[in-house]
Structures are given as C-alpha cells and as structure tokens.
Amino acid sequence: MEAFLKEFGDYYGYPDGPKNIQEIRDTEFKRLDKGVVYLDHAGSTLYSELQMEYIFKDFTSNVFGNPHSQSDISSATSDLIADARHQVLEYFNASPEDYSCLFTSGATAALKLVGETFPWTQDSNFLYTMENHNSVLGIREYALAQGASACAVDIEEAANQPGQLTNSGPSIKVKHRAVQMRNTSKLQKEESRGNAYNLFAFPSECNFSGLRFNLDLVKLMKENTETVLQGSPFSKSKRWMVLIDAAKGCATLPPDLSEYPADFVVLSFYKLFGYPTGLGALLVRNDAAKLLKKTYFSGGTVAASIADIDFVKRRERVEEFFEDGSASFLSIAAIRHGFKLLKSLTPSAIWMHTTSLSIYVKKKLQALRHGNGAAVCVLYGSENLELSSHKSGPTVTFNLKRPDGSWFGYLEVEKLASLSGIQLRTGCFCNPGACAKYLELSHSELRSNVEAGHICWDDNDVINGKPTGAVRVSFGYMSTFEDAKKFIDFIISSFASPPKKTGNGTVVSGRFPQLPSEDLESKESFPSHYLKSITVYPIKSCAGFSVIRWPLCRTGLLHDREWMVQGLTGEILTQKKVPEMSLIKTFIDLEEGLLSVESSRCEDKLHIRIKSDSYNPRNDEFDSHANILENRNEETRINRWFTNAIGRQCKLLRYSSSTSKDCLNRNKSPGLCRDLESNINFANEAQFLLISEESVADLNRRLEAKDEDYKRAHEKLNPHRFRPNLVISGGEPYGEDKWKTVKIGDNHFTSLGGCNRCQMINISNEAGLVKKSNEPLTTLASYRRVKGKILFGTLLRYEIDEKRQCWIGVGEEVNPDIE
C-alpha cells in the first residue's frame, strides 16, 4: 500500500473530507466486513447504512401524502418533491430557468420518453455513438418508424485540446457508419432538412469501457454541426438536439449543464447512491420540452377533461405535462439523504478517490505476465492513465489470456471470483456497440454467434476462438485499496501462470501444478477397481436412492432423471435455484411400479404410479434448451404436493419415452453437452456420472491441508455430494481422467470426459439443513481447471446391447481401457 499512497495519497481516501475512507467503511458499510468485495458499481452502487437510517427515520417520523391531494400533508409532500427537483438540478449545475427535472422510473424510462415524444419526421436524423447502452439504441425504433434516418458514429479526437477550432476545423470529428432507413424511397431535400429536428445521443461515460466522452460535443453539434459532420450525409442537417446518457458517469463526474447545455440528460438514482431503485430522472431544457409531442394523458397531467366528448386541457408546467400518475413520492423523499451524503464528500473528491483505484488496477493488470513472458490481460478503453486527464471513469474492462495466447472465458473468471467473494460483472453489459468495437467482432461474426445460440446472459463466452464479452470491475465512493488489492491478488493466483521448476531445477511455464503427494505418484500397475455403489435420481435435482442392482436402458439407468420440476414461468427448477430440493427423497419400487416421494415439509408421502393414466398428454409444449418435448402433466394433487415441498408454485413433468430426445443442451449451449449420440432423459450432459472414491479422498486431504477451520467445522466429503450414478473403489486418484472406455461387469461404456462442476456441489444437506459454502469448488478450481471448466468425475455413455436385458450391480469388476 505504501507505493500506492506515494502515487495517489493526495487523492485517495477523502483526506480533506468529514470522514476518511476507513471511517466510512467502519461506520457505514459494516456489512462488507463479511468478506464481500463489491466491484460492480457501474451496475449499481451500494447504499450507506447511515443513509438508510436517515431515510427510515424520516419515514417513521413524518407523514407523507399523495401530492395530487390538497391536504396539508399532501401539500407538504408536493413541496418536498419540488425541493428534490432543485437538488437534482443543482447536482448538474443546471438553472431552473433553463431546465426542468422530470422524475421517471429510471434512466431507461427517461430515454423511452424522449424517443416517443421527439418530433420525428421523415427528414429527421438520429445519430448515436457506437458506445451506447441498449436503452439508447431503442430510440432508433421510434426514429425509423417515423421514416427518419439512424446512424451509429465513432468520435475521433485529433488534438490535445478537444473542441478547439483549428485551421481545418474542430479537433473532434464524427465518423459515420452505415445509414439505416426503413423508408428507402425518402428524398432529403435541403430545404426540408433545415426544418426537421435531429437528435444526437452519447454517454458521458461508456458503461462498457469507462471511456469518458468529451462534453464539447454538446456545443459542437449545436453550433458547428457542418464542420463536425463534414463528409457525412448529415452535414447539411440543422436543428440538432443533444441527449447525454449520464446514468454511468454522473456518480463520479456529473456533466456541468451550465457549461455543456445538452437538451436532454438521463440518470438513475441507484447508480448515484444505491437507494432508491426504480427512480430516475430526465433533465430537459425548457425550450426543448416545448417541442416534444406527447399523446397520452393521465391523472395529474390534465387541467380538465370531459369523459364523453373529445376534450382535454393539459397542464402547462413541464413536470405536470409529462409526469403521468402520482409521483413516487416516498422514493423521491429518499433521494434527499443520498444527495446529502454525496455533497459531504463532494463529486470531485469521489472522482479522485475512485479513479485512483481504477488506475492502480489498470497498471497492475498491464504489467502482469505469465511465466513465459506472455501478457495475462488485454484492457479495453482509454490508454491514458493520468488521473488529471478525465479520459476514463473508475471502470476497468478486460479479458484474460492463457500462456499460449488462447482466451480464458469470462464466465470462468466470474465463477472463480464469486468463490473468492468478489462480485464483478461479465458479458457485454447491454452495450453491443462498444462490445463489438473493442472485441473487434464483425457483423458476420456477431450474426454467426447468434446463429450458434449465443444470446445475452448465456454461457457462450468464447466462440471460434474469440471472446463474446469481457470482464468489468468498477469502483464506488466507498471502495478501498484493500478491495482493489484483493482483486489483483485473485487474478494473479487464479490466472497468471508462474514459472514452474522441474526436478532438475530448470524452469518452464506451468499452470496449476499438482500438489506433492505420495498418493499422486504414478504407479506401474493399477489395483483392481470395483463398483462400490449405484444411485438413481428419478427427479432432477432431488435426492436419489441407492440400489444393489438396477436395470439399464437406452437412456442409462432405468427411470434416472425421468421427471423434473418446472416453475410457473416455464423454467427448470434445480438446486441452484431451490437448494431445498435436495431434501426431497425419492424411491422406486420396480415390482409395484411406484415412485415414492417424501419431504419433511409434507405430512404424507407421495406415491405416483409409473405406468398410469394420470399422465395425460396435452397439447402444450415444453421447450427446454431448444428441444421441444411433450408434457406429461400430473394430477393437481401431485403438483400441490411439490408446491408445498419446494415452497413455490410448480408442477412435475415426466419425460415422454415416445419422444426421440437429444441432449437438453443441444443448440442453446454448444459444447456443453457431451452426449450427442444417444438418448438421455433430463440429465444435463450425459447418461452417467462416475466418481472415484480415491479422487474424493485426495480432495479431502487437500481440503484439510488447506484450512484447519474447515477440517474442524465439516465432515469429510462423501462421494455422493457430487450426485454420481456410479461410485468406484480402487485405482489411483484421477485415474479415471485417462479412461477411453470402461467395462463394468458385462456392460460397456464410453468415456465422454470430465464433468464440469458448478456451485451446486457447494450445497450440503447436514441433518436436514441446507448449507452453502465456497467448498469444495474453490479447492477444485485450484488444481482441476481445464480451459475454463472445473472438472471432477467422469461422464459415461452406455453402449446398449439390444439383444439382452442388461443389469448393473454393486461389486462388479471395473475394467478401464486407458488412453
């Protein structure tokens, strides 16, 4: 920390503030002492505990009323709302004579309001920077629908003094991309261009990269448009209005509207001080507000209306004209306390504090190297790391590379960060233009990715050797050096490959070396293997039952994962979402043809006949991972039982054996499913999961050696923690990794490779209580990671023998064919 303070000590920690950063953390963010490192302030910053105390003291000490009423309390509430508007305008240094503050449900609603009320004509143009949020891109739909043109642009700065006029014009240039039009027959006459209104939109700070845009764009687009747009088809267009998306940037450096008089500015208050959510604002120049065309009217926006004839007289004040319905007056009351907090620290001090942390992290990531000298990190955004430049906000966006130059998937980073208590964000952050621009993804690649099944928030982080998104960390006013340091330490320990010493003392590049252990030394021959246990899981994500002997079929173990529980919105319910599903016990009596289910939450056991008319085929369809299946809907009593057992509305579905069924994950998640050649029920990846007792024993040794507290607090892991179908005994730890095929008794299986583990194995069921921790996944991640996957256990496909009825039994010999 000494080196950090030497460089940033004058800027970090609020040295001139009422409290320094440590005092702020100790008194207002005690909840972060539980090991949470929160680095997603670009998504939402955190509320202060002191801030919330003030808010709820206000709520419990005062009475608030609907501002549309005329009582004393309602009038006082109206005055409070007016004061809040002034606070917002003051924060942006905007005069009430020039601007009005309209409260909305968020920045997105504010942008939508601009889009739907802007005076579009077929001669209008909508220009927007590539680095814009989807909520800004959505305005394009309104423009194109009215026959206007739309075009994405890139901003180029040619000099060190942005906006200054030179002999060749201003140093800022707007470079346009393809022009989009739906009315291709439209003719742009020069005289009509002069009468139409046009809109230019840009963010004060890019939420993808943290790049801060030069606010001189406001004046240049309004006063020097022809030169700035020189060479584009828009250079002759007049009457440009400017919209700034300040949702990301205003938390640390709000635009000064007295100097940069944008026509529209949008924000969300949870980005500023964490609470309230669901409240934003549109700051609109009063002269611009007069041009907006609003169709709908509502309570609060009319002076008078007549129900049975076409007559309405609207209110004239800007706020009353545009704000439909009753204002969210309690949320508006809460923002006063948030602004009080920001004012005590000052935006300039917050800017210096947060940006010093982001610059520190960027420098550390830039310098990070693998053991072979290859760079670990690729950064996106401004390369200027001077705090005084104001070129970049407190955001660091990057991707990580392996020593061989291939990419770590961003989901791997997110998974491991979560295990380390670090909360960050991955993907494209709803900013497709910036994402494509920085990742150098062409239109054909973007379309190809979509055709391959890639959509927002899915698992496809690397396609055709290129990342589809990135990793983002961002800092807020309460972030500390310790947060930044823990993040850097995490990156180094998890992704930077150190030099590795070999037995003869030479150094080579390595990654996740095996821990020294006599048990891991190679042996000349394998001891005998045998099948230790068999477990059938009739209902996906519920508890299974062990058997001594069980029949095999085309889908694996008979009735394994043949049922699943579906939520009301169509999602598959699993232990990831509902950990209590592990408490639901199951058993199948083959002779009686009964599936029995029990739960501590239900008094009676549930009995379901496996062959029964209670499964009535219906016309509705269930779409799971792009596979259309026929629903087998259970009786009302069965669905009611599962609703009580799980604690949410749901229904039980059975896989239709008459349907030719491929892997659940085909198409939607390329590469996730290993078993594309055979039929499976509701399993994720393959028919069988095999776990080795010896591998589990080695994992237990590592856990005990790593953490004495863990050893005292937890029992040794049981192989069934990993939900295997088959547990084997014998052999060496992880010997199953090398299997190509395996024969168990008289049955043949093909190895499909390792099983990719997730946080589900961190859920334990001890004495009927569901508990979550970071283990064993954290320890497995330290030595079982292979190209973004944490592998433990082996997936198998059963090579069915159609000529005979096949069974598998405990105690049978296991004979692997090793690669």
Swiss-Prot record:
Effect of residue 106 to E: In los5-1; induces a deficiency in stress-induced ABA accumulation
PROSITE patterns: MOSC
Catalytic activity, reaction form: Mo-molybdopterin + L-cysteine + AH2 = thio-Mo-molybdopterin + L-alanine + A + H2O
Induction conditions: Up-regulated in response to drought, salt or ABA treatment.
Annotated GO biological process: abscisic acid biosynthetic process; auxin-activated signaling pathway; defense response to bacterium; Mo-molybdopterin cofactor biosynthetic process; molybdenum incorporation into molybdenum-molybdopterin complex; protein import into chloroplast stroma; response to cold; response to glucose
Disulfide bonds listed in the record: none
Active site location: 430
Enzyme class: transferase
Keywords assigned by UniProt, alphabetized: Molybdenum cofactor biosynthesis, Pyridoxal phosphate, Transferase
Associated pathway: Cofactor biosynthesis; molybdopterin biosynthesis
Pfam families hit by this protein: Aminotran_5, MOSC, MOSC_N
Residue intervals of the MOSC domain: 650-817
Required cofactor names: pyridoxal 5'-phosphate
SUPFAM superfamilies on file: MOSC N-terminal domain-like, PK beta-barrel domain-like, PLP-dependent transferases
Tissue-by-tissue expression: Ubiquitously expressed.
Single annotated GO MF: pyridoxal phosphate binding
EC nos: 2.8.1.9
N6-(pyridoxal phosphate)lysine modification, residue list: 271
Cited function: Sulfurates the molybdenum cofactor. Sulfation of molybdenum is essential for xanthine dehydrogenase (XDH) and aldehyde oxidase (ADO) enzymes in which molybdenum cofactor is liganded by 1 oxygen and 1 sulfur atom in active form. Modulates cold stress- and osmotic stress-responsive gene expression by acting as key regulator of abscisic acid (ABA) biosynthesis.
Family, per entry: Belongs to the class-V pyridoxal-phosphate-dependent aminotransferase family. MOCOS subfamily.
Entry protein name: Molybdenum cofactor sulfurase
Naturally occurring in which organism (per UniProt): Arabidopsis thaliana
